[in-house]
Each structure stands twice: as C-alpha cells, then as structure tokens.
Amino acid sequence: MFFVKKDIQKLLSVMIPILVAQVSTAGVTFINTTMAGHAGADDLAGVSVGAGLFYPLLASIIGLLMAGTPLMAQLIGRKERESLPFIVRSGMVIGLSVWVLFTAAYIFFIDHLMAALALESAVEYIARYYLMTMIGVVFFIALMIPLRCLTDTAGSTSISMKLFLMAPVVNGIFNYLFIYGHGGMPALGGIGAGLATMITYGFLLVLFVLVVLKSKELEGRTIFTSLSLRTQDIREYLVVGVPSGLSIFMEMSLFSLIIVFLARYGTDALAAYQIADNFASLVYMLPVSCSMALTILIATAVGANDMALARRYKKAGFVVAMAGAMITASFTVIFRSSIGSVYTDDAAVALIAGQFLIYSAGWQLFDAISTPIQGILRGLKDTRISFILMVLAYWGGCFPMSLFLDTHTTLGADSFWLGLDFGVACSALLMVFRLLYVERKLDGRPVPTFAGILALLSGRKTAPAAVSVYTISLHRNVKKAEELLALWTEMEEKLSIIMQKIKESEVDIYEEMGRILPIRMSLLTDLHLSIIGHATRAYIP
C-alpha cells in the first residue's frame, strides 16, 4: 500500500501543474468569448465562427508537437540528456512546417471558405481577420510547445504551470485595450480578441525561451547555438506525433459534425448541446492531465528499463482517473439543473441541457479508462494503432450508432448523446485490449494473433502457432524433434556466450539487450520442454 500511495503522490505532483496549465489555457478562450460578447453580437458571432474553425486545427497541431514529451522522457530515463536539443529542434522544424502550410491554406482558401459559410458581411469581416491573427498564434505555438515538452520532462511541470497562469491575465489586459479601444488603441472588437491572443502566446514563447536559456539542466544554450538536426529524430517525432494529432482532429471533427445533425431539432437543442459539451470539455481536462502526466512518468521509466515502475504508475493512473471520474460524474448528475442555469437564463434550454448532462456523465466514466491508456501508450511510443482504434470507435461505432438511433427510434436529439456514449465506451474497450497486447509483447509473453482468435472461435483446442509443436510432442516424431532439439542446443550455447560477454562489458548499449536475451532463452526452454513431451501452457492452451 505504501508503494501505491507513493506512486499516486508522484503522479499527482506531475499532474496537478498540468491541470492548472490546461485550465489557464481554457481561460484564454473563455475571456475572448466573454469580452467579445460585450463588444456586440456581430463580434461574438465572428469570434465564435473563427474559433470553431481554428481550434480543432490548433488542438491537432498541439497533439502533433506534444510527441516530444515521450521522446524526451525516454532519453532522460536512458540518461542521454545530450540528445534533448536534437528533439527540441526537430519539434520546432516540424511546427514551423505546419505554420507554413496553415499560412498558405489561409491565403489560398479563405475567400472560398467565407463564401461557403455565407455569413453576414459584418460577421464575415470579423471571422476573416480573426483567423488572420491565428497565423501568428500558430507560429508562436510551433516554437513554444517543443520547449514546453522540454521543461515538463527535463525540468518540472510546475514551470509550464507558472508561465501559463500568466496567460489569462495578459490576454485580459490586451483584450481590454484592443477590443474596446482603451489606452489609445483602436477599438477592433472581435478582431482585437484574436490580436490579444497572438500577443499572449508570443509573450509565453519569450518566457519559455528565457527559462530554458537560464537553466543548465535544460541544455538551453545548446539548443539555440546549433542548428544541426538528425533525420531519425524528425522521423520518430512524426511517427509518434502524426497519429496523435490526427486522432484529436478526427474526434473534434465528429463533435462538430453532430452539431449539423442536431440543427433540425431547433435552437434550444443546439444551445443545450453547447452547454453540455462545454461543461464536459472542462471536466475532460482532468483525465487529459492524468494522461499527460502518465506519458512523462511511464516514458521515463521505460527509458530506464524499469518496467515494474511503469506498471505501478499505470495502476496509480487508473486509481486517480477513476476516482476523479466518480466524483465529477456524481457532481454532474446531482447538480445538472444548476449547471444548466449557470450557462443560461432560458428555463427550456437549461432543462434540455440537464438531460444531456446525464449522458455526459457516462463520457466521464469511460474517458477515465480510455484517456489514461492513451497517455500510457504514448509513453511507450505506441500511437499508430491507437489512432486506428480511435477512428474505428468514433467513426465506425459512434457515428453509425447515432444515425441509426436518430432514424429508427423516437429518441430525438438524445440519439446522438447515446451514440457518443457508445463511441466512448468502444474506445475504452479497444484501448484496454491494445494495452494488454502491448504489455504482453513487452514482457515476451505470447500475444494473441488474428489466426489464433479465429481458431478459438471455430472450436479448435489449439492455436495454429502451437499445432506443430503439439503434434511433435503427441506423436513423438523423433527425427523432427531431434532436429529442433539440436537447433535449440546450438542457439542456447550461442546465447550463453553472448550473455557472458554482456555481463563483462560496461557499454551502455547492451543494457536493453541484456533484458531481451533472457526472455528469448526462456522461450527456447519452453520449446525444448514441448519437444520432449512436457508441453507448457504458453504453447498448449
């Protein structure tokens, strides 16, 4: 119990600063929306349209660049801190490349996009130039996120917490100046909110650069005094980051698409959806922060080849996430009417929102399973399959189920919430299976194969991979057994020689091999036992 408590304390020490930073970032969006709303309805509408178009892309870009976290954490675990600057520079190069693409997309497609939206002229003007200011936001974030990955892993998550706490204050000050035209500045309305956001992130970038430069532990001067890159670092960054970024984009795209289908149920249903979705997004910061903390801790443990510690952090993560979900879900259900009233004075909208909030409580419970697992898998640099499973869960499960319930039942707008619950549940189930698969593979244990599953479903008592050994053991095919036994003996002798050399060597590169080779020898021993007639459960279910 002491170890569990200690691991939970360690997780919380990393997670809480991340949570505070997440809330501070959300505060910037809240301040923009609130202050733009006081400038006028057109300003609020323009900012809402611009933010609705931009923030799914921004979240995807951040998801891509946050891939630096597991890469750097594993380097720290392996005590290879001298390689950290290469990862930071790789992230910056990738981020700047994304910024160039975003800028080009704005230049060439903004007119077509505005025409397709068919907005009122005043709203279109604000949305167009609000999105222009977001070009600057992407530029600053492209350079800032790799530095945040560095401070979170090589330093402390409290660094980014302290810096992000300044964001709402700085943003509020510049909103006051540029939205309303105080201090001799022009009154730009909603466009001023975008300009204030750009200045805020530029300010944060400067702070991160100063912190990194002043810290010897963060290899700050090495980062900025050299421009050298390594192709393998960029490739690995993309391999881990692209699936993460795409998964965020696909998930947010689905939620945006559901709004389109809800439109036919009226303004009240749409407003209620926005209320429930906004509150659920705020609560979602808890499992997301837990997930980000798990990525750092598990990647560091894996880099140090301490899988036992990684498993303890995994258990601590589930305890924290589930405890948090039980509290927030209970709060959501019990106080759903009050929550709706905070967002609106319209009793009808608040009533519908309260009903939707019950469904969002289901999200919270399933997210407490799937989201931490995503962080664990990121720590293991396993993101590609997770992305595929997420797409299957949401676009192959959630969306079809929502449409089916909408067209074949009388549930109305509730159909889409039930579909979302179904999708999140599918995501949680698939993530559990993926984690179990990856863990068995890392442990050197036999992993289930598609052919083996088919054999099991068809009623066969043995998996295809075990049939040949089982047949040899059962029928005593002496010649074949002797050939395999000779091969086993030869390989065992070679492995013993290699193991002896590894023990005598002090070269760090052999540390991981030293863990893998005994596993392989254990598997060979099982094969030997199977051949001579003592089949093990690993081969004969």
Locations of the language-model features?
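Short alpha-helical transmembrane segments in multi-pass integral membrane proteins
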Residues: 1-18, 72-139, 185-242, 298-363, ...
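Signature of the first transmembrane helix
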Residues: 9-69, 73, 242-262
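Transmembrane helical elements of multi-pass membrane transporters/channels
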Residues: 13-29, 133, 167, 200-204, ...
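Helix-terminus/linker motif at the lipid-water interface of multi-pass membrane proteins
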Residues: 23, 27-45, 114-121, 177-188, ...
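Interfacial/gating helices of multi-pass transporter permease domains
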Residues: 36-55, 87, 122-126, 190-191, ...
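Small-residue-rich hydrophobic transmembrane alpha-helices
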Residues: 44-104, 141-160, 259, 270-336, ...
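Short runs within selected transmembrane alpha-helices of multi-pass transporters and secretion channels
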Residues: 65, 134-152, 160-171, 193-208, ...
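Long, low-complexity or tandemly repetitive, helically biased scaffold regions used
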Residues: 470-476, 480, 503-541
